[in-house]
Regions:
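Histidine-dependent nucleotide/RNA phosphoesterase domain, centered on the 2H-phosphoesterase fold
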Residues: 1-178
Length: 178
């Protein structure tokens, strides 16, 4: 048995982080929905996933960061309108979604997917759907809201996060504007 089988792993993903004021506003809006199903995602965990990597060997992280640093970025801050509430029944989640993803965001996701191919992370088999998860284990219809969602997620960098026991920790970040 090789030492490789004992290599520690981290659960990683690339995402756009939410600013504290965005988190507060979204959490307040979610609270007004008075939801009676599911588990709320803690506001400090709000983000928009770009590319989920899953379990990654610790020894690969530096190379992944080097590859991410070479990703061609939009050159402008990203603005993603989160203007739709949706229930993804298969996953049991309530999400804030974007009616239309900005082309710059789609190009960034594609560039990240291409940069991760040499590490064995394949292109996502599904179409990228920008979203922010509000609730997990959600089993009801889309809730009615007195105020429609109109949140603009603004990002000037993208981040590599580690997920550990429900807590997300930023490991590295790269600017979108050079």
């Amino acid at each position: 048995m090789s030492d490789e089988s004992h290599e520690p792993f981290k659960r990683l993903f690339f995402a756009l982080n939410c600013a504290p004021e965005q988190r507060r506003a979204i959490a307040q809006w979610r609270g007004a929905l008075q939801l009676r199903s599911g588990r709320p995602v803690p506001a400090e965990n709000f983000h928009l996933t770009l590319k989920f990597l899953g379990a990654v060997g610790v020894a690969q992280i530096a190379d992944i960061c080097t590859a991410a640093a070479k990703v061609r970025v939009p050159g402008v801050a990203l603005r993603v309108m989160l203007d739709r509430v949706d229930v993804w029944r298969r996953h049991g989640v309530l999400v804030l979604a974007s009616e239309q993803a900005p082309p710059e965001l789609l190009r960034l996701v594609y560039a990240l997917e291409q940069a991760m191919l040499p590490f064995g992370f394949e292109d996502s088999p599904k179409e990228f759907r920008p979203h922010l998860t509000l609730m997990r284990d959600y089993r009801l219809p889309v809730p009615e809201s007195a105020t429609p969602p109109e949140f603009i997620l603004r990002a000037e960098h993208f981040t590599l996060f580690e997920s550990h026991k429900g807590c997300y920790r930023a490991l590295a970040e790269w600017p979108l504007i050079l």
